[in-house]
UniProtKB/Swiss-Prot annotation:
Protein name: Hemagglutinin-neuraminidase
One GO term describing the cellular component: membrane
GO biological process: symbiont entry into host cell; virion attachment to host cell
Record organism: Mumps virus (strain SBL-1)
UniProt keyword annotations, A-Z: Disulfide bond, Glycoprotein, Hemagglutinin, Host cell membrane, Host membrane, Host-virus interaction, Hydrolase, Membrane, Signal-anchor, Transmembrane, Transmembrane helix, Viral attachment to host cell, Viral envelope protein, Virion, Virus entry into host cell
The organism's taxonomic lineage, starting at the top: Viruses, Riboviria, Orthornavirae, Negarnaviricota, Haploviricotina
GO molecular function, one term: host cell surface receptor binding
Subunit structure: Homotetramer; composed of disulfide-linked homodimers. Interacts with F protein trimer.
Membrane topology designation: Single-pass type II membrane protein
Residue ranges the record marks as coiled coil: none
Site (Binding to the glycan motifs of the host receptor): R180, K242, E264, Y323, Y369, E407, R512
Written domain comment of the UniProt record: The C-terminus (head domain) is involved in binding the cellular receptor.
Length: 582
């Protein structure tokens, strides 16, 4: 090769000049191109993967959305079905609880009115032997055993002057005669009444007879009601019935008494309860009387006494108030040994260590006057469809819910059950409970008591148990003064103060004097209307209210034992007054 075509290097190396340089550039470019292509492919692959992932996610989201949409549609369909079912159920509930009872009541009232017309106009109807049916005037039927006030608003009241009407209660007819212990029951169709007629002053353990009557409410020409007596029975058969309670039942009256010829304190000292009598008196002059031995009586009770106040006919059962002395080692005595109820008046509390007050409250159930037996309240419950075989039981409330046993009354108003208990023990205020029974076909029935806190006034008492005492102690005091609730009681806060009731109290903390008609709220008296002269001696009172639905007038009959200076120690007087509510 020619020398001019070569370069001589210092290290003796030889390199071809032009062609060698072009080959190296091509190789570098090719490498860069390959790297670029690979990078583009890698980026493309990454983009494909990302895009594919996003597509998959979108597809999955769409599927989930479709599923959720499907579920939502199904829920909406179910909700529509449920709403439809709820609507039907609401219609059924309204029909059963509101419409149907109103229709039944309307049909019943129409039937009663029709029967009254038939019996009045057709003298030959065999079922109407007296030509006067045992049915109250239609003006009063819908206003009996109903709450006069249905709301919880604040109201004002006034008690009118006593209305002049013939008394449906006879008095004693001799200076040493005595009529005592009234018991009155007003039902939708008729009323029943009884009292004891004691032959030797007012010593009821000696010899007595029992007066029983039934009748209806009628309207007088003056526009106000009258208690018209249709039947009278005078039980004078040598039995010394005591503390009788009355109840209206279909076509007549039921009466629960006990028979004893010894002092009350001696009954508690014994070990076997006195004879219990259940008497059924019907409008057709039929009388059926049976000696009963309710389940739970023998072996548990030293004595059992009717509550004096009226009983009720409820859900095909007769329910009477009762109380008595429990044997200490009996099943009932052992079960209730540590039970006690200690209410507190927040406006006038009793001071002292709570444990000490609890012990004193427990001891109050065991007064020495009654041989230190636990004095216990109870209810006599008899199945009406088995009344002729006297299938009765004693239902005993817990003493954790009630004070010491005492006389009482069972009320049925607007299908709600209430129980008045006389304040015989240390608690000085009116005692009223809402009650509910659980009846069983087999086994022991039960009752739940819910105390209504009343602090408005106190009945008279004696010694350490005067109306001013608010601390637990052993007492046998007080007097029977049952109230009539005008409104339903509510446990909701803020409206309880508008619970109203009426009755006749004795306006003294220590003496049975000054009978006074009243209307009261829970914590204060709204109206006071004294009856008779200042210092008039009085005793038991029982009150019943009803409404004339023809003109919406409200009437109350206050039956009171009042002192008599002419015939006997007491005269039982029914005082009828009109109650105005604004």
């Amino acid at each position: 090769m020619e020398p001019s075509k070569l370069f001589i290097m210092s290290d003796n190396a030889t390199v071809a000049p032009g062609p060698v340089v072009n080959a190296a550039g091509k190789k570098t470019f090719r490498t860069c191109f390959r790297i670029l292509v690979l990078s583009v492919q890698a980026v493309t692959l990454i983009l494909v993967i990302v895009t594919l992932g996003e597509l998959i996610r979108m597809i999955n989201d769409q599927g989930l959305s479709n599923q959720l949409s499907s579920i939502t549609d199904k829920i909406r369909e179910s909700a529509a079905v449920i709403a439809s079912a709820v609507g039907v159920m609401n219609q059924v509930i309204h029909g059963v609880t509101v419409s149907l009872p109103l229709q039944i009541e309307g049909n019943q009232n129409q039937l009663l009115s029709t029967l009254a017309t038939i019996c009045t106009n057709r003298n030959q109807v065999s079922n109407c032997s007296t030509n006067i049916p045992l049915v109250n005037d239609l003006r009063f039927i819908n206003g009996i055993n109903k709450f006069i006030i249905e709301d919880y608003a604040t109201h004002d009241f006034s008690i009118g002057n006593p209305l002049n009407m013939p008394s449906f209660i006879p008095t004693a007819t001799s200076p040493n005669g005595c009529t005592r212990i009234p018991s009155f029951s007003l039902g939708k169709t008729h009323w029943c009444y009884t009292h004891n007629v004691i032959n030797a002053n007012c010593k009821d353990h000696t010899s007595s007879n029992q007066y029983v009557s039934m009748g209806i409410l009628v309207q007088t020409a003056s526009g106000y009601p009258m208690f018209k007596t249709l039947k009278i029975q005078y039980l004078s058969d040598g039995l010394n019935r005591k503390s009788c309670s009355i109840a209206t039942v279909p076509d007549g009256c039921a009466m629960y008494c006990y028979v004893s010829t010894q002092l009350e304190a001696n009954d508690y000292a014994g070990s076997s309860p006195p004879t219990q009598k259940l008497t059924l008196l019907f409008y057709n002059d039929t009388i059926t009387e049976r000696t009963i031995s309710p389940s739970g009586l023998e072996g548990n009770w030293a004595t059992l006494v009717p509550g004096v106040g009226s009983g009720i006919y409820f859900e095909n059962k007769l329910i009477f108030p009762a109380y008595g002395g429990v044997l200490p080692n009996s099943t009932l005595g052992v079960k209730s040994a540590r039970e006690f109820f200690r209410p507190v008046n927040p406006y006038n509390p009793c001071s002292g260590p709570p444990q000490e007050l609890d012990q004193r409250a427990l001891r109050s159930y065991f007064p020495r006057y009654f041989s230190s037996r636990r004095v216990q309240s109870a209810f006599l419950v008899c199945a009406w469809n088995q009344i002729l075989v006297t299938n009765c039981e004693l239902v005993v409330p817990s003493n954790n819910q009630t004070l010491m046993g005492a006389e009482g009354r069972v009320l049925l108003i607007n299908n709600r059950l209430l129980y008045y208990q006389r304040s015989t023990s240390w608690w000085p205020y009116e005692l009223l409970y809402e009650i509910s029974f659980t009846f069983t076909n087999s086994g022991q029935s039960s009752v739940n008591m819910s105390w209504i806190p009343i602090y408005s006034f106190t009945p008279p008492g004696s010694g350490n148990c005067s109306g001013k005492n608010v601390c637990p102690t052993v007492c046998v005091s007080g007097v029977y003064l049952d109230p009539w609730p005008l409104t339903p009681y509510s446990h909701q806060s803020g409206i309880n103060r508008n619970f109203y009731f009426t009755g006749a109290l004795l306006n003294s903390s220590t003496t049975r004097v000054n009978p006074t008609l009243y209307v009261s709220a829970l914590n204060n008296l709204k109206v006071l209307a004294p009856y008779g002269t200042q210092g008039l001696f009085a005793s038991y009172t029982t009150t019943t209210c009803f409404q004339d639905t023809g003109d919406a007038s409200v009437y109350c009959v206050y039956i009171m034992e009042l002192a008599s200076n002419i015939v006997g120690e007491f005269q039982i007087l029914p005082v009828l007054a009109r109650l105005t509510i604004t």
